[in-house]
Amino acid sequence: MDVLTQCIVGISLVLFGIYGFIAILIYSFEREDKLEAKRRNEIIEYFTSNGFKYNDFSTIFPNDVRDFNIAHTDKKGYSVKNYIAETYGQRDGVDITIVDHTYLESIGRQRGCYEHALCLLRNQEIKIPDFYLRNRIFILDSIKKLFGMKEIIISEDKEFSKKFVLQGQNEEEIRNFFNSSIRQVFILNQKRGCEYESKNNSLMVSKRKYFLFMTAGYLNVKERIELLENSLKLFNSFKS
């Protein structure tokens, strides 16, 4: 094989590799688009048949969540990318909105893109103190406490305080609110990847989907239904 032929073969192999890689990328993007379209259609079918309305993009929701820290709005270190697949309606006298939310988080020069679902529940007749609650991460939270992390420990309920980190400004009001029945509802409905925050008598639930130790995109319709039912069960427990 002469030098010219070797060059032609080499260039052909390189081009084949490049075009093959591009073809794989195009296939991956098309497959992802099809899966996302299927997911949204399933969400539309279920929620609209159960009294909810649907928007591909939310323009109202960002204004409702600006005060919530777990919404990761336009605060320092965060920038909102979009609110999509919005479903909203009313159940048991509670106004409920669920959206898929993508945001960018900047720490120094590093920037990461994250997805989670947000469920906002409101009923003006239900009074809730402002609080934040999440699952305890034992090693990480032990380190945070060494650096001054403050939390509200329910000493009479070791199971609850072992499972959750509870925080808020008005400790006495929060302690009175988190009675044994409400604590038990949280324990029974504990889910991986969930955070809870109350502001202005509204409850927001953030739910992340995980694969092993990494976040894994948006919730499917079954997972969104589960988020709805569990969040509503929690919120209704506040009525008593």
Language model segments and positions:
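Feature marks short, highly hydrophobic, charge-poor N-terminal signal-anchor/signal peptide-like helices
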Residues: 1-14
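Alpha-helix capping and helix-coil boundary motifs
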Residues: 4, 28-32, 220
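Transmembrane-cytosolic junction motif
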Residues: 20-46
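Charged, low-complexity intrinsically disordered regions
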Residues: 40-64, 69-240
